């Protein structure tokens, strides 16, 4: 992925998958909705898409086998349908499953919520999986990149942000770092984002809260943007991706790229 152009990465938030509490028994409709969103993102001009088991609340720390298999099927369908770079995130913190799926479907990157350190979450205490993931990458070598959160959203963190950031990169071996607001759709703290950019030897990606209104300000400090909530119909995360809203954000990004040349 070309971080020189500050890519827009659009979220494909999946409906509840088999193996999750809210699954309604209709897997075909899950796949169809995911493909519609992925195609819309490609048509709008997004630079990449990322698929995530967003609907699987309440999340376990690690996904069960049914969920992993189902997510792989959806990811492969998206891989076959669109030509954009593809990412995988398995909530709440199953980077091993995410990498395995990405390897199987030839995806390009994964997101890991807690690669290093400890997060206090609604799933309990989640510990980093950097060692386990590094060993899997060694066994299954590929070009798949690891995007790792620092002080991930929907969690409480007691350590220093700068220390956690550097640990994630230097000891966790993240290929890029993700900085988010406190929750899905909530904007990132610009001061924290600026600090991340100042100290980071790897790309810094905004992981939540990017909108048409704040993109110009965030553009100064970020190398990429994971966008979900704002590009949905009416700006509501549970809705489908809106072609109009997604195109509007893409056009703004084009203007910002041009102005920075």
From Swiss-Prot:
Classification via InterPro entries: BtpA, RibuloseP-bd_barrel
Domain of life: Archaea
SUPFAM superfamilies for this protein: Ribulose-phoshate binding barrel
UniProt family annotation: Belongs to the BtpA family.
Alphabetical list of NCBIfam families matching this protein: thylakoid_BtpA (TIGR00259)
Name of the protein described by the UniProt record: Uncharacterized protein TK2179
Organism this protein belongs to: Thermococcus kodakarensis (strain ATCC BAA-918 / JCM 12380 / KOD1)
Taxonomic lineage of the native organism: Archaea, Methanobacteriati, Methanobacteriota, Thermococci, Thermococcales
